[in-house]
Each structure stands twice: as structure tokens, then as C-alpha cells.
Amino acid sequence: MQAATVVINRRALRHNLQRLRELAPASKMVAVVKANAYGHGLLETARTLPDADAFGVARLEEALRLRAGGITKPVLLLEGFFDARDLPTISAQHFHTAVHNEEQLAALEEASLDEPVTVWMKLDTGMHRLGVRPEQAEAFYHRLTQCKNVRQPVNIVSHFARADEPKCGATEKQLAIFNTFCEGKPGQRSIAASGGILLWPQSHFDWVRPGIILYGVSPLEDRSTGADFGCQPVMSLTSSLIAVREHKVGEPVGYGGTWISERDTRLGVVAMGYGDGYPRAAPSGTPVLVNGREVPIVGRVAMDMICVDLGPQAQDKAGDPVILWGEGLPVERIAEMTKVSAYELITRLTSRVAMKYVD
């Protein structure tokens, strides 16, 4: 009998990278593995994707873990560096870095490095989070081209705010700003992440940066799943029944007695709870799979246990397998039921959840 376990399907991960190459055949792939590869395991994910052209991370520590784990492909620091003292390490490890503000640019100009750094100038085209404003961008770009510590040519990167919406005027405006600035400049270009890859083929350019879709999860909020785009779920959150109980009509279950049975039935108790990262907000009716059969959660999610209504004729027994999301039950459905985004669901699992990798 197993308690909370994440099963990561390496074959599905490799399939998804190939599928994304089919969707963006002229672009190179930055496989985004920040936040422990969206909960899938940083090193194991990178090692499963030797055909990725580069890897994208949010923190220098993540990049260093990749290098220490034997990953030699280019690694892009998507948020840039946070401290000028990190520049010698970035140079020595041949990391690529975003540069998005005056402080970073000044640090590059003042640094003493053995080798120049590959830079991606971040242009704020409308996300208004990181990046150089368009009216300041030409002067900023010129300084990068003159900086001895910057490997030439300077590359240009931006990020969509609403790429998960088809036919979005804001995205069209961002794309126009990006195209205007990049015109005539020799560096590589990248603006498309998961939503851009799926919905905005005109944004693919030299590099694309698949994040959540690489793991088989749709970035869209339209009830689509990764399968709608030819991708397969990589993560399955699994557990087991630890008890099966007879339950009488009119009896409540769990804290607060929020669910009362309308029939005699059999209840299963699953070794899973918010202590594992499963959302406490999951309402009664949220589906799980028991022996491949969909059954509803009943009552409140507790720290360590969830109750499910197996039905009056159920033959399930303690030790039988349970899938909370993944193969056969898309995490996007759980996100819709719980009002917790799929991004958060897959990255919030706690350290007591075991990790298992299969091919």
C-alpha cells in the first residue's frame, strides 16, 4: 500500500517535447524547468530531455544544480541575475541571462570577467512586470552592444501577458511592439511561451519557451486540456485506499459534517490531504479515480485524508490504487473544480509526497 506518490512519466515528457517541435518546427526549444520543473523534479526532467536546445530557470541556484547534475546545455536565467557578484559565476558556467533593468546593465558594464556573457535583453512589450520600456529600449540596447562583457550579438526576449486568449488585441499589440524593436537587429528573438506556442504561431521566432504545456497541461482557461493539443500528462498524483467503511443514510462524514449521505453506501478513505499539497478547497463532488473508476470526494479535505463515495455496490478494498489527477483524470478538471490553477496544483505538492519515475 502506498501513500501520496507522484508518478512522472518520462515517455510522456519526451513525447510532449517532440509534439511542441511539430507545432513550432522552425524554433529552438528552451525547456522551462523552473520551480523544480513545475513540481516534476529539476534534474530528472532535464536528464529526460537531452534533445532540448536549452533550459530555462528562474534562479541562479537552479542553474547551478543543473550544471552540478551534469547538464551541459545552455541554461537561461529568465529573471536575470539578482546580485552583481554572481556575474563571474554566470560567465564561468556559460549561463545565458536576461537583462531587464538599469542596475543589471550597470553591473555588466562595471564587471571584470574572463569571458563575456550571453545576454537576452528583456523588452517590456506590455506585461509591465520586468523589462525595458520601449521608449528607453534603443539606448539600453546600444549600451549592451558596446559592453565588453556582453557576447555579441545581443538577443531580445519578451513575455506575453494574455497569450492564453485567442484573438486578443493586447497580444497583437505586444507582438507589434516586439517586431518593431527587433527589426534590423542581428540577435536571436523569443517571445512565445506555452500560450504563444499553441495559439500564436506568428510569435514563434528563433526560440520558444514551453513551460506548463511541456508537462502536458494546458495553459488556457477554456476547459481545454493538454490532450487537446496532442500532449500527454506527465504527472499523476496517486495514493491508496487505507479503509473502506459501511456508511448509513443520514450520516455525515468528516470535519464539520458538511456532507450527509442520502443513501446507504460505502466510503473509501484515501491517504492524501492538504498536508501533501492537495487543495483543501476541493468541494464535495471533486472526482478521483479508484481502480480506474471515477468517484466523488465527500466532506472536507483533511490534512492527511480524503473520503470518497464508492457507491453501495462497490467491491473496492483497502490498498486499492487511487489517482487524484493525471492519467485518466486531467489536472485541468481538478483546477476547474477547486478554483486553484493547474500551475499551482502541480507546483505546491509537499516534501512528504514520494517521487517515482517511469518510462
Curated annotation (Swiss-Prot):
The keyword Ligase does not apply. Its EC number is 5.1.1.1. Pathway: Amino-acid biosynthesis; D-alanine biosynthesis; D-alanine from L-alanine: step 1/1; Cell wall biogenesis; peptidoglycan biosynthesis. It comes from the Bacteria. GO terms for cellular component: cytosol. Keywords: Cell shape, Cell wall biogenesis/degradation, Isomerase, Peptidoglycan synthesis, Pyridoxal phosphate. Substrate binds at residues 129, 303. GO terms for molecular function: alanine racemase activity; pyridoxal phosphate binding. The modification N6-(pyridoxal phosphate)lysine is found at residue 34. Its cofactor is pyridoxal 5'-phosphate. Signal peptide: none annotated. GO terms for biological process: cell wall organization; D-alanine biosynthetic process; peptidoglycan biosynthetic process; regulation of cell shape. The keyword Chaperone does not apply. The active site is at 34 (proton acceptor), 255 (proton acceptor). It catalyses: L-alanine = D-alanine. Belongs to the alanine racemase family. Catalyzes the interconversion of L-alanine and D-alanine. Provides the D-alanine required for cell wall biosynthesis. This is Alanine racemase, biosynthetic. It comes from Escherichia coli O157:H7. The gene is alr.
